[in-house]
């Protein structure tokens, strides 16, 4: 038996040798790519700037794993249907469900979020600083227009000490900047399986009152039966420069998705027989969803002095959601959600014993209210009401962070966040209100990190962090107890984790960037998903005793020639149950399902200054277990994608064209895997080779 620390010891030896080699290759006297005093980067490989991680902008000084993505990864020639297309290359991040828009994309970071049956759990999502994650930890991205996103940052690891509940990782998305003059864009894309996307935008950023408006209409027939979708999306933002020290930004988002059908999952025999088929129950019960959502946000920024600034944000979301599930009892859900919040953050820079110290203090208040009703699903028709409950989740929080540059070599960061969560259910179905309940949770999430500069462009770092995650309101309301008459599942509790990380990152010889991280997390009360025989297709949740997650993440980026960039990434994930007994079976040492043990990614970009580009991406996924017992798995598979495009200048305007091809190797893989599904229905097949093309005109 291989000792469980074997890989960690091997990695430590590799890290030491790797750093020694890099350090020997660097020349401190001539290599000036990271300036500590000015916090800027100068090198031939385009610099990374961290803009979403509180008050830190230099990744070499930051003792955390952060991946920054630019427009070439996010939007150049992409189909633009799901966020997973853009985040595929991030180490430690695993995305599924690019084809089932009724279930929404599933994203996990270092295993956090892997339990989700639909949407995103366990990680926080922001757009231009506004939270897209509700107070209880749910994120849906059906309202995000991916062509509107210009850059992104991913914090790979626990961040509850900064962002609170369900922050096993953080995804920060930033929309495109205001154009320097009045600019109009129009684009159209089309592709396999009835895909189409029509978009238009107008904006102007030349004055102190800037604006940008973008609309899009998407349709998709789907690879599988009963997988059609359509949506209309509108985004607008305005920036008002009130004076030289303050500005006000207002953002509005609207989405109307009247149809997103759910083809359901299949067992292995059904998937092998006909990959395009839908589960017959999903057709009979007309499974799918529709969404209508409005979101409004405002941000005020004030430069208090030359060394301090204040930011205040507020937001409100109104969401109406209804779906049909592939069973009768409670198989139709109607949800009306209101979610609002306000946050304030003050940052000041000073000196302590002649050394720079930066302090951030902040407070957040958010309130989520879900009116959830369930009806019987009579083969697509609404039956009698069987559930009616008002669920609320209120969060009050305070946090602080300090960053202290001890000398020109050592930077220390520490801080904590204190959260109070009030969770309540009011039963409107049973007249005596027996289903009502209330609980209050308090949590402190400390963290500390240290960075040591090997030279001006390379560093090693370590950090410790604490992460807590409450069950979402949806998870709490799905009580597996057949005698339950409403309220929340009293046996479902928050999970708590403690994480330790070491790593190194930096730039070598003006053309090479590396990022290597080793992490380990211990999770108590890990929340897992499962199904019951009497309710196939409905997901329930439970706590297991303990799990351990440890892994290695490596990413390399290099300019290998004129206009050519090569990105490589590797992730090793060893996520195991440590204290879990199920049906009298000891599952200690079993791997957590739904996550590949090994992932390798390779992207090569050629971008000609005249506008021509070609991008090739290859991703290799290792074995993925499908249930807690580890007696079902899928074999390793590889995905090869290609994007080609060009830009033409015509009469003062620009014409862009692109064509893309996905899964060129014709792999028979699965776009989604339903963990612990009853009856072996784990599989949602993905399409084989498919193409798309598009054009855009910029006036």
Spans of features found by a protein language model:
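A beta-strand signature from Gram-negative outer-membrane beta-barrel systems
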Residues: 143-187
């Amino acid at each position: 038996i291989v000792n469980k620390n074997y890989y960690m010891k091997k990695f430590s030896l590799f890290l030491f040798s790797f750093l020694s080699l890099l350090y020997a290759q660097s020349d401190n006297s001539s290599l000036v790519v990271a300036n500590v005093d000015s916090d800027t980067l100068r090198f031939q490989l385009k610099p990374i700037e961290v803009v979403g991680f509180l008050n830190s902008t230099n990744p070499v000084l930051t003792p955390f794993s952060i991946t920054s993505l630019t427009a070439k990864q996010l939007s150049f020639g992409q189909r633009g249907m799901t966020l997973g297309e853009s985040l595929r290359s991030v180490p430690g991040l695993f995305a599924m469900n690019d084809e089932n828009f009724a279930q929404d994309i599933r994203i996990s970071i270092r295993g956090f979020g892997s339990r989700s049956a639909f949407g995103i759990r366990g990680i926080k999502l922001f757009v231009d600083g506004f939270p897209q994650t509700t107070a209880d930890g749910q994120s849906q991205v059906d309202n995000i227009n991916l062509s509107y996103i210009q850059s992104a940052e991913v914090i790979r690891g626990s961040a509850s000490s900064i962002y609170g509940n369900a922050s096993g990782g953080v995804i920060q998305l930033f929309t495109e900047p205001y154009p320097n003059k009045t600019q109009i864009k129009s684009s159209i894309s089309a592709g396999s399986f009835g895909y189409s996307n029509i978009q238009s935008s107008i904006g102007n950023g030349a004055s102190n009152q800037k604006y940008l408006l973008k609309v899009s209409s998407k349709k998709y027939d789907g690879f599988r039966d009963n997988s059609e979708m359509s949506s209309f999306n509108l985004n607008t933002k305005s920036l008002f420069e009130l004076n030289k020290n303050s500005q006000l930004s207002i953002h509005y988002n609207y989405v109307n998705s009247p149809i997103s059908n759910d083809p359901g999952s299949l067992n292995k025999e059904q998937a092998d027989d006909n990959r395009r088929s839908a589960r017959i129950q999903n057709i009979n019960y007309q499974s799918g969803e529709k969404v209508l959502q409005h979101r409004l946000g405002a941000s005020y920024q004030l430069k208090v002095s030359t060394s301090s600034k204040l930011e205040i944000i507020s937001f409100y979301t109104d969401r109406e959601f209804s779906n049909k599930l592939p069973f009768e009892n409670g198989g139709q859900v109607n949800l009306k959600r209101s979610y609002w919040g306000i946050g304030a953050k003050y940052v000041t820079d000073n000196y302590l014993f002649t050394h720079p110290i930066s302090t951030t203090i902040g407070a957040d208040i958010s309130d989520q209210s879900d009116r959830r009703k369930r009806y019987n699903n009579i083969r697509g028709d609404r039956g009698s009401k069987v559930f009616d409950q008002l669920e609320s989740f209120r969060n009050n929080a305070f946090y602080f962070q300090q960053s202290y540059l001890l000398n020109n070599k050592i930077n220390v960061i520490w801080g904590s966040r204190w959260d109070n969560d009030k969770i309540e259910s009011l039963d409107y179905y049973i007249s005596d209100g027996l289903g009502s309940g209330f609980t209050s949770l308090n949590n402190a999430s400390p963290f500390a990190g240290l960075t040591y500069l090997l030279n001006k462009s390379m560093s090693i770092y370590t950090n410790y962090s604490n992460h807590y995650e409450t069950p979402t309101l949806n998870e709490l309301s799905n009580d597996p107890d057949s005698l339950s008459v409403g309220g929340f599942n009293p046996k479902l509790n928050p999970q708590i984790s403690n994480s330790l990380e070491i790593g190194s990152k930096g730039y070598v010889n003006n053309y090479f960037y590396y990022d290597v991280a080793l992490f380990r997390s211990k999770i108590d009360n890990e929340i897992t998903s499962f199904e019951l025989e009497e309710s196939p297709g409905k997901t329930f949740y439970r706590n297991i005793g303990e799990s351990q997650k440890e892994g290695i993440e490596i990413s390399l980026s290099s300019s290998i020639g004129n206009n050519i960039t090569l990105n490589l990434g590797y992730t090793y994930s060893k996520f195991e149950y440590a204290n879990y007994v199920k049906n009298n079976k000891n599952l200690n040492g079993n791997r957590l399902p739904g996550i590949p043990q090994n992932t390798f990614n390779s992207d090569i970009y050629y971008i000609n200054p005249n506008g021509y580009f070609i991008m090739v991406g290859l991703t290799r996924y290792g074995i993925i277990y499908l249930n807690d017992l580890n007696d079902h798995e899928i074999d390793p598979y590889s995905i090869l994608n290609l994007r080609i495009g060009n830009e033409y200048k015509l009469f003062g305007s620009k014409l862009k064209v692109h064509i893309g091809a996905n899964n060129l190797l014709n792999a028979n893989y699965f776009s989604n895997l339903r963990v612990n599904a009853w009856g072996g229905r784990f599989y949602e097949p993905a399409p084989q080779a498919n193409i798309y093309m598009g054009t855009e005109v910029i006036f």
